[in-house]
Curated annotation (Swiss-Prot):
Gene designation per UniProt: atpF
Protein name as annotated: A-type ATP synthase subunit F
Keywords from the named record: ATP synthesis, Cell membrane, Hydrogen ion transport, Ion transport, Membrane, Transport
Main location: membrane
Any one GO MF annotation of this record: proton-transporting ATPase activity, rotational mechanism
Assembly and binders: Has multiple subunits with at least A(3), B(3), C, D, E, F, H, I and proteolipid K(x).
Entry's family note: Belongs to the V-ATPase F subunit family.
Species for this entry: Methanococcus aeolicus (strain ATCC BAA-1280 / DSM 17508 / OCM 812 / Nankai-3)
Alphabetized Gene3D superfamilies for the sequence: ATPase, V1 complex, subunit F
Subcellular location: Cell membrane
InterPro entries: ATPase_V1-cplx_f_g_su, ATPase_V1-cplx_fsu_bac/arc, ATPase_V1_fsu_sf
Biological process according to GO: proton motive force-driven plasma membrane ATP synthesis
GO cellular component, one term: plasma membrane
Its job: Component of the A-type ATP synthase that produces ATP from ADP in the presence of a proton gradient across the membrane.
Length: 99
């Protein structure tokens, strides 16, 4: 399974330099949503990485997709939230609460 990256220029450039091939630069949330939907239908993609800010804008539209989508901070830093979505995923998958 491959990892795909969907994000802004700074994010995608970093992942390209790291050697990832399935890297897609998008200009806005609509482009990101369309790209992620296309990637969701590809059998060779197992994980999609995007930015927290894009994820926030398209969350309702991507919540029922098949692929595992990970949101990471962009160049502006992490979004402050009441709950950490990674902790929630770990708790659901493993049954252990991270502190």
């Amino acid at each position: 399974m491959k990892i795909a990256v969907v994000g802004d220029l700074d994010m995608t450039m970093g992942f390209r330099l790291a050697g990832l091939e399935d890297v897609y630069e998008v200009k806005n949330a609509e482009d990101a949503l369309n790209t992620i939907r296309e990637l969701d239908n590809r059998a060779d993609i197992g994980l999609i990485i995007t930015t927290e800010r894009l994820g926030e804008e398209i969350r309702d539209s991507i919540s029922n997709l098949k692929k595992f989508i990970v949101e990471i901070p962009d160049k502006n830093g992490a979004i402050v939230r009441e709950h950490d979505p990674v902790k929630t995923l770990v708790r659901k998958a493993v049954g252990v609460e991270l502190k």
